Amino acid sequence: MKRSMYAGRVREEHIGTTITLKGWVSRRRDLGGLIFIDLRDREGVMQLVINPEEVSSDVMATAERLRSEYVIEVEGFVEARQQANDKLATGMVELKVSALTILNTAKTTPFEIKDDVEVSDDTRLRYRYLDLRRPEMLENFKLRAKVTHSIRNYLDDLEFIDVETPMLTKSTPEGARDYLVPSRVSQGHFYALPQSPQITKQLLMNAGFDRYYQIVKCFRDEDLRGDRQPEFTQVDLETSFLSEQEIQDIVEGMIAKVMKETKEIDVTLPLPRMSYDVAMNSYGSDKPDTRFEMLLQDLTVTVKGIDFKVFSEAPAVKAIVVKGNADRYSRKDIDKLTEFAKQFGAKGLAWVKVTDGQLAGPVAKFLTAIETELSSQLKLAENDLVLFVADTLEVANNTLGALRNRIAKDLDMIDQSQFNFLWVVDWPMFEWSEEEGRYMSAHHPFTLPTPESAHELEGDLAKVRAIAYDIVLNGYELGGGSLRINQKEMQERMFKALGFTADEANDQFGFLLEAMDYGFPPHGGLAIGLDRFVMLLAGKDNIREVIAFPKNNKASDPMTQAPSLVSENQLEELSLQIESHD
């Protein structure tokens, strides 16, 4: 029989009609001789009623065999439900079954197919096809489909061209580790799976495509966390002849359209803008969460003259004030915050509380001389908690920024219904890497430096600024972009500043440098993390919830057991040997 409609879409207007439904048995109940079945499909659940006095003995026998997750086909008459269920969209109606067929049986599932089920993440991933049956998960992927549909329509209307770029590319040394693919034909040579289509999309601008986009899979072999996966999807854009402001206007329009069509939220444009320096100094993060205050305060000058060398001799002393919540933090709680602070390089965490109008705590005695000035600068009030970090400016900012976010979550200070977008602009071109012992690109080596700072490529790299911009949502980097270098001489200077010899630059990027000999236009773009965007719209805290078949924190798939060993024959074809490192 042909399905008439989805079970979750049956409504009062269908009363009096005979329909055919197909789906899964969510629940079966036997009450007073009647059998009640909750039939589930992707659109929801509908109650079926099987009355032994109104169906054949075969139908009744089939109904008695039903168990959870059996796949069935039913035909019946839609009636008004005697006792409505306001919790279901179909709660005003039920189906009086006249015919019933079992299409497939099911073993007892390892967990219940329902929302808020308590089960380990690895079990969910091991049986992902069952996990995805849960209504909450289905809603996540309907939302994801709406977002991608909205984005495609918006960019198509602006005459962007959707172009697929290669999945097998050249490995480059900048950025995260590549996933490498050995070549069978060119033995000893490797492809890399793309971390992004950065260079190929720039070459499309050289080809005259003018406006490119792609919703594309990317790959990075990096340590995983809640908002990262080894393979992820990004909305990739590139344009020619536009300024950074024009590119940002396009992206803002796209964001506003998505928010209106998926959340019915009107986003006020233009979005707020914040410099990188303000973000780091006031929020302790280059992706500030602006849904709450608790800004970082610089006390370096204020504490210079006090008799406490930890403060007076530190390169920087900064603090955050936890307003009106000092009584929520015992010494044991603050010890836990101190251990947390050490993860970000801090040597410790100093603190005082405002109790009975006075400062109290381990360092209060050192602050007596400046108590009035300190209270005024920090706008202190009764029951405030002040947390200090004395260290380098970088460590102080990073530590207090992380503490700020943790405390806001602990104290439930964040309005989860808010969506605060902003641009972070005026980025440094380079970041110092302690691990590498050199400057690295803050974004990538194809970013255009500002005209005012480009001369420092041969001088102080810390002073070089980039024409770069990140879009931030609720403390997450949603995407990043920049204007790109289109002049060969500037690109060669950039590679040299990053420590490449001319031969190394030519070996890695010679094809790009050669392309710059053939009229490369001014261009720029941006990429937005689609998984992360949908995660935030869905109110989740892990992108696994919006990726159909994700990996776990070990970059493994418990369902397929990937990555897995391969046969000796496969290795021989690729001229590879596996060495044991016991």
Swiss-Prot record:
Record-listed E.C. numbers: 6.1.1.12
Keyword Cytoplasm on entry: yes
Residues that, per the record, bind L-aspartate: E174, R220, H443, R484
Ranges where the record places region Aspartate: 198-201
Chain residues that bind ATP: R220, D221, E222, Q229, E477, G529, L530, D531, R532
Localization terms from the record: Cytoplasm
One GO molecular-function entry: ATP binding
Reaction catalysed by this enzyme: tRNA(Asp) + L-aspartate + ATP = L-aspartyl-tRNA(Asp) + AMP + diphosphate
Top-level class of the enzyme under EC nomenclature: ligase
A GO CC term assigned to this protein in UniProt: cytoplasm
Family statement drawn from the similarity comment of this UniProt entry: Belongs to the class-II aminoacyl-tRNA synthetase family. Type 1 subfamily.
Name recorded for this polypeptide: Aspartate--tRNA ligase
This protein's encoding gene: aspS
